[in-house]
Amino acid sequence: RSADMHFSSIELYNYGIYKGLHKIDLVDRIDKKNITLIGGMNGRGKTTILDSILLCLYGRKSAEYITGKKEAYSKLLRDHINKSAVDKSTHIKLTFQMDDDEDTVLSVNRLWNQSGNKIDTTLIVEKNGIADLYLSENWEYYVEELIPFGIAKFFFFDNEKISQIADDDAFDKIKDSIKSVMGVTTI
């Protein structure tokens, strides 16, 4: 049985236009709805929030989708450090609950720091509030089991990405991604 997952919160620190610490609670405690819409004026950070979710979950793999071009991961990270922050460290922390037998709560914390031209990165995954070394070291495999990157972009998108998603060439990728989630393999 596969487990459902529900995002609880996202925390941004010196990420993009978000200077300092910003935490967004994604839990609908009243109606218990499963879809979160983020609205706002142009240039106010909606796309930044969506991109941060993909970056937090998929790291290096998300770079081309976020930027729209083959770009170095370190450049993407450098470009997303808040320009006016004195502290050149940045993090994205995404917390979600699994509807599994144990009601597991996972927090994925992707941190990076700029020192001169060098970018140092760290990934810490917590399970029920405790750092889990195994999950941290194997996160890229674990997250592909939860939501393969190929279909993640169909859940986290904005109007700027719709044309990318609707591209005719993407149809085969969509089929492959759906088969992957369903556990179907073609021989």
Residues covered by each model-derived region:
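Glycine-rich phosphate-binding loops of NTPases
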Residues: 64-78, 102-154, 167-176
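Conserved NTP-handling cores and scaffolds of large molecular machines
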Residues: 53, 57-61, 147-151, 181-186
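A generic structural motif
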Residues: 13-15, 95-99, 103, 124-126
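Residue-level recognition of well-ordered beta-strand positions that form the cores
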Residues: 11, 93-97, 109-111
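Short glycine-/polar-rich loops that comprise or flank the Walker A/P-loop
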Residues: 6, 87-92, 116-121, 150-153, ...
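Conserved P-loop NTP-binding catalytic core
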Residues: 36-41, 50-105
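Extended, Lys/Glu-rich alpha-helical coiled-coil stalks
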Residues: 159-187
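Pre-Walker A-like glycine/lysine-rich segment at the N-terminus of P-loop NTPase domains
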Residues: 2-58, 178
